[in-house]
Swiss-Prot record:
The lineage of its organism: Bacteria, Pseudomonadati, Pseudomonadota, Alphaproteobacteria, Hyphomicrobiales. SUPFAM superfamilies: PRC-barrel domain (SSF50346), Translation proteins (SSF50447). Its main location: cytoplasm. This is Ribosome maturation factor RimM. The PRC barrel domain binds ribosomal protein uS19. Residues 93-169 form the PRC barrel domain. Keywords: Chaperone, Cytoplasm, Ribosome biogenesis, rRNA processing. GO terms for cellular component: cytoplasm; ribosome. GO terms for molecular function: ribosome binding. PANTHER family: RIBOSOME MATURATION FACTOR RIMM (PTHR33692:SF1). It is found in: Cytoplasm. Binds ribosomal protein uS19. InterPro entries: PRC_barrel-like_sf, PRC_RimM, RimM, RimM_N, RimM_N_sf, Transl_B-barrel_sf.
């Protein structure tokens, strides 16, 4: 069975004239991309080997094998780079790869279905879990032990304790989402999510 692919980096604009590029990594240690072996596009049609990288503000400046001039580097702008999930290190307790969370069923502590995990975000004030209900607006909740007390990867679900701040229309929307999914079909039954980990 093929291992799930994890996006570990995205290539940005060219840097200089010798084929270097700006590289945004999604790893806990930005330089970990040097240790994962060949990186590929999502469809596997292209492979890239990072030959060197250095830190620069909020990104890396990196070189790839075979990319030696600015024109070649410019053509890579926007390319996302992936590695197989089994090539990454195991996570610690209460740490999760984003890709392992996306798609999990979300339920309330009372067992009512809410929808599925759509994404994990961080806008600078902590991690946010986005839940997509069967209909209506998505729910954006803090990804903390208090709000998400249980992550059951084996069972394919997360348990959500809806915070008191979700009231009025938002709380009603969440309750309606749970009710709507009940009527359809029940799904199969401080956190630190990360897109990838240290080598």
């Amino acid at each position: 069975m093929m291992s799930k692919l994890i996006c570990v980096a995205r290539i940005g604009a060219a840097h200089g004239v010798r084929g270097e590029v700006r590289l945004w990594t999604f790893t806990e240690d930005p330089l970990a991309v040097l240790h994962y072996g060949p990186l590929t596009t999502k469809d596997g049609s292209r492979s890239f080997e990072v030959t060197k990288a250095r830190e620069a503000k909020d990104h890396l400046v990196a070189s790839f094998k075979g990319i030696t001039d600015r024109n070649a580097a410019e053509r890579l702008n926007g390319v996302e780079l992936y590695v197989p999930r089994d090539r990454l290190p195991e996570t610690d307790d209460d740490e999760y790869y984003h890709a392992d969370l996306i798609g999990l069923a979300a339920e309330t502590t009372a067992g009512a279905p809410l929808g599925r995990v759509l994404a994990i975000h961080n806008f600078g004030a902590g991690d946010i879990i986005e839940i997509a209900p069967p209909s209506g607006s998505t729910l954006m909740l803090p990804f903390t032990n208090a709000v998400v007390p249980t992550v059951d990867l084996a069972g394919g679900r997360v348990i959500i304790e809806l915070p008191d701040e979700i009231d009025g229309e938002d709380r009603a929307s969440a309750d309606e989402s749970a009710s709507a999914e009940d009527d359809a079909a029940a799904p199969n039954s401080a956190r630190h999510p990360r897109e990838s980990g240290d080598p």
